């Protein structure tokens, strides 16, 4: 049996990021063969990763990459469990690898992007960091002039597609989308069910009580018009110059806004609130069963 030297343990720790005792045991099980130890740890890491999948990964980062000729761009969201991990250099390097592969392939299918080496890298990162890590979504915008913007510590990412215009115009519109969060490009894109729901809310407001039906309907029309302007990108006051709308800003730059994608870390993910005492009790119970 080969000796497990401190130097071997250190090398394995450096290569895997695992603790000293775990590395020492792995080397002992592998008779001092570091490559076999790594192979065995990779097998174990798959099990560890699977055990963490029940947790909620609602933190993380978003990232954007746009082609040099602005013909297309991708936006990616990768989740972790905590913002501490979201700032980890290894995590950010993994995110960059995901972006690069999605960008090169113009691929939005997460499973296809993650197939092969990236999934192995994800599992290794889960093992090293100790948190659930998942690639949640990938968006592609292609055609016309595409601009991108990342805001607020990599927590909001935007891609904007213009017809005409320039990279600078697209970037400025993307910055506006990040800051103001419009629902649609223009009022005609607002889903009918959203408009109907807004009408119901307006009808139920106290100042509508006792008014004639025709007056109520006129007030609803006016308030819906205001709602649509506030929610539609092209009708919003441009964030860098509120004296003009986004449509006017784009037109001055020779552009028309065609579409946008806005990703915000964790949006739509429900995070369960667990009582601390109950969580500890659950962990103790689980340990007793194992």
UniProtKB/Swiss-Prot annotation:
The gene is tsf. It comes from the Bacteria. One of its GO terms (molecular function) is translation elongation factor activity. It comes from Cellvibrio japonicus (strain Ueda107). Keywords: Cytoplasm, Elongation factor, Protein biosynthesis. InterPro entries: EF-Ts_dimer_sf, Transl_elong_EFTs/EF1B, Transl_elong_EFTs/EF1B_dimer, Transl_elong_Ts_CS, UBA-like_sf. Belongs to the EF-Ts family. GO terms for cellular component: cytoplasm. It is found in: Cytoplasm. This is Elongation factor Ts. It holds the Pfam family EF_TS. Associates with the EF-Tu.GDP complex and induces the exchange of GDP to GTP. It remains bound to the aminoacyl-tRNA.EF-Tu.GTP complex up to the GTP hydrolysis stage on the ribosome. Residues 82-85 are annotated as: Involved in Mg(2+) ion dislocation from EF-Tu. Its main location: cytoplasm.
